[in-house]
Swiss-Prot record:
Name of the gene encoding the protein in the UniProt record: Add1
Membrane topology: Peripheral membrane protein
Low complexity: bias regions: 1-11, 678-712
Biased amino acid composition, Basic and acidic residues: 576-601
Protein name as catalogued: Alpha-adducin
Annotated segments matching region Disordered: 1-21, 418-486, 576-735
Localization (cell): Cytoplasm, Cytoskeleton; Cell membrane
UniProt organism field: Rattus norvegicus (Rat)
The record's note on its domains: Each subunit is comprised of three regions: a NH2-terminal protease-resistant globular head region, a short connecting subdomain, and a protease-sensitive tail region.
PTM sites of type Phosphoserine: 12, 59, 64, 334, 353, 355, 364, 366, 408, 427, 431, 436, 464-465, 481, 586, 600, 605, 613, 705, 708, 712, 714, 724
Main localization (coarse): cytoplasm
Family: Belongs to the aldolase class II family. Adducin subfamily.
GO MF annotation, one: structural constituent of cytoskeleton
């Protein structure tokens, strides 16, 4: 193309659709060597390169673990829908192809075997191949046993314990019907699957042939049948021929206790093996040599046998037996003989603990109690699953701890999320690394948007603001972040019926009110204690205490405590005489009051002569407290008879005021004075009355008192006045 042609193109009217070649050549540099190579390439070769580029994406999708998981979930859903649905065989073939085509990115096998070659080629036959009608033919327990035994065969091949098609590992399926699982004779250990195992009875007759057309080596099964018949506790038997085991079986010293693995086997049994067990006497002899408790049997010049109550226990004993034999063979080769070896004492040797402790700082709960060999076997099953064997083993305890999310309190996810694909044409399929990265981003975005469980709806533009506003509306049926946990305080692994019965029993006790304070003392059971009430003690009369018989001897007191309870007869007699003397003095004081009323001016009203009592001293020198009108007495610090003088108008232990005396009746002291006919001379003749420090200012008639109508504001209120009997004694002393 020259310059004239380009000018003609410019001047000509533009076409409606520009040609594709012209846009392409405008973008391509003709002098680029890469462009020249592609232009000179043959069309078929160019098409092949384009197909390879397209297949790269397909292969990447097929090799992604996410696609495998989704495919397996689809297969499981198809199994649930029917036995032979349309397209199930195609999905199964795709799943097998995906399992076999996974690249070898996992760690290598422990030692080797045929399985190592298969893994290097990316061709691993899955252990759990029970699908379709095969899985329906067996119950759940037999499925698990088939998967365990087939995985055991794979482990034996990986550890190098296999010897072509020989050796056998068997397990008991049903103790009632005496059915056993064994490998078909002619199948390598690396080819054994769950469906290929053969079910036989105790005589070696085939009950279920499995998925193969191979038979059973009945001569090899006779050893297993003899042990199963003698040991009902045996659930799994392993018989292998390893070089180290055959070497130890040929030694006269047998297995020496020179390693912890040798001591972990317990009592080791030996049997002189003379070939295949064809007669009954040989079976009886091997049963006698094994005994009822031995877990390990060494066949002289032949091989090793282990017996276990489970598949895991049988693997544990055979593994330790093989390791102990290898240690002994290598030790004898370097030491020169058994005499140069140091033997361990089984009684003093402390075996390692099999129950791991709870990790520090974790409160999620203790791990399960492992049986013998379960923890080791489960770890090896995880290894096989990581290698792509698909063992189908039911794990008891997860190896990886699920990290608790930081924002687990936000239960309700966001109504809207900001995550989107890179482009509209992106289908969502990506590489595993990108898928993991996007999953983390989605988790973070989900939490950021999950602050509210409401629905966000945007309102359109209005006249006030050109921007859209977000309006939150409450979602119906929204769950709260905290929900009640059922049976929160019920212990785990308990019978719920027992918990309900205990709850009903507690409720019945509460309704019938039959709960007690607990067991009574047997020492003080029959002792009756008489309690005497002391002065000032608070006596309770609670109805609940009386009815519940917590306090059998209850004294119900309707009045106050007796103030004369602690006084002697002599003190009571002196108190009686003192009261009589005071009453006599009150009568004389009343006469003096009448005389003063006559001499007083007529405009002043009469005020009752009830002066407060002041402390006096008896002949014993004891102070006398003021008395109350009603005869009650307040206790003193010393055992002095209480003063029940009728002069005081208050019941409390306090001096009355003038205002209180003003409201008192002038005749209040008269009945008390007339009640005592005895003369005032009945008091003790030797009693001396000492005048109190009160002055003469406290006269009986105080015009400044509150009760007087002629009260003078210049006069101060007198709170304390001299008693009448003290005034009388003072007059006598003056005269």
């Amino acid at each position: 193309m020259n310059g004239d042609t380009r000018a003609a193109v410019v001047t000509s009217p533009p076409p409606t659709t520009a040609p594709h070649k012209e846009r392409y050549f405008d973008r391509v540099d003709e002098n680029n060597p890469e462009y020249l190579r592609e232009r000179n390439m043959a069309p078929d070769l160019r098409q092949d390169f384009n197909m390879m580029e397209q297949k790269k994406r397909v292969s990447m999708i097929l090799q992604s673990p996410a696609f495998c998981e989704e495919l397996e979930s689809m297969i499981q859903e198809q199994f649930k829908k029917g036995k032979n649905p349309t397209g199930l065989l195609a999905l199964q073939q795709i799943a097998d192809f995906m399992t076999a085509s996974v690249p070898n990115v996992y760690p290598a096998a422990p030692q080797g075997g045929m399985a190592a070659l298969n893994m290097s080629l990316g061709m691993v036959t899955p252990v759990n191949d029970l699908r379709g009608s095969d899985s329906i033919a067996y119950d759940k327990g037999e499925k698990l046993l088939r998967c365990k035994l087939a995985a055991f065969y794979r482990l034996a091949d990986l550890f190098g314990w296999s010897q072509l098609i020989y050796n056998h590992i068997t397990t008991r399926v049903n103790s009632e019907q005496e059915h056993f699982l064994i490998v078909p004779f002619g199948l390598l250990y690396s080819e054994v699957t769950a469906s290929s195992l053969v079910k036989v009875n105790l005589q070696g007759d085939i009950v279920d042939r499995g998925s193969t057309n191979l038979g059973v080596n009945q001569a090899g099964f006779t050893l297993h049948s003899a042990i199963y018949a003698a040991r009902p506790d045996a659930k799994c038997i392993v018989h292998i021929h390893t070089p180290a085991g055959a070497a130890v079986s040929a030694m006269k010293c047998g297995l020496l206790p020179i390693s912890p693995e040798a001591l972990s086997l317990g009592e080791v049994a030996y049997h002189d093996y003379h070939g295949i067990l064809v007669d009954e006497e040989e079976k009886i002899l091997i049963q006698k040599n094994l005994g009822p408790k031995s877990k390990v049997l060494i066949l002289r010049n032949h091989g090793l046998v282990s017996v276990g109550e489970s598949v895991e226990e049988a693997f544990y004993y055979i593994h330790n037996l093989v390791v102990a034999c290898e240690i002994q063979v290598r030790t004898l080769a370097s030491a020169g003989g058994p005499d140069n070896l140091v033997l361990l004492d089984p009684g003093k040797y402390k075996a390692k603990s099999r129950s791991p402790g709870t990790p520090a700082g974790e409160g999620s709960g203790s791990p399960p109690k492992w049986q013998i060999g379960e923890q080791e076997f489960e770890a090896l099953m995880r290894m096989l699953d990581n290698l792509g064997y698909r063992t189908g083993y039911p794990y008891r305890y997860p190896a990886l701890r699920e990290r608790s999310k930081k924002y687990s309190d936000v239960e309700v996810p966001a109504s809207v999320t900001g995550h989107s694909f890179a482009s509209d044409g992106d289908s969502g399929t990506c590489s595993p690394l990108r898928h993991s990265f996007q999953k983390q981003q989605r988790e973070k975005t989900r939490w950021l948007n999950s602050g509210r469980g409401d629905d966000a709806s945007e309102e359109g533009q209005n006249g006030s603001s050109p921007k859209s506003k977000t309006k939150w509306t409450k979602e119906d049926g929204h769950r709260t972040s905290t929900s009640a946990v059922p049976n929160l305080f019920v212990p785990l692994n308990t019978n719920p019926k027992e918990v309900q019965e205990m709850r009903n029993k507690i409720r019945e006790q509460n309704l019938q009110d039959i709960k007690t304070a607990g067991p009574q003392s047997q020492v003080l059971c029959g002792v009756m204690m008489d309690r005497s009430l002391v002065q000032g003690e608070l006596v309770t009369a609670s109805k609940a205490i009386i009815e519940k018989e917590y306090q059998p001897h209850v004294i119900v007191s309707t009045t106050g405590p007796n103030p004369f309870n602690t006084l002697t007869d002599r003190e009571l007699e002196e108190y009686r005489r003192e009261v009589e003397r005071k009453q006599k003095g009150s009568e004389e004081n009343l006469d003096e009051t009448r005389e003063q009323k006559e001499k007083s001016p007529p405009d002043q009203s009469a005020v009752p002569n009830t002066p407060p009592s002041t402390p006096v001293k008896l002949e014993g020198g004891l102070p006398q407290e003021p008395t109350s009108r009603d005869g009650s007495d307040a206790t003193t610090s010393k055992p002095t008879p209480p003063d029940l003088s009728p002069d005081e108008p208050s019941e409390a232990l306090a001096f009355p005021t003038v205002a209180e005396e003003a409201h008192a009746s002038p005749d209040t002291t008269q009945p008390l004075a007339e009640a005592d006919p005895e003369p005032a001379s009945a008091s003790a003749p030797g009693a001396e009355e000492v005048a109190s420090p009160a002055t003469e200012e406290g006269s009986p008639m105080d015009p400044g008192s509150d009760g007087s109508p002629g009260k003078s504001p210049s006069k101060k209120k007198k709170k304390f006045r001299t008693p009448s009997f003290l005034k009388k004694s003072k007059k006598k002393s003056d005269s």
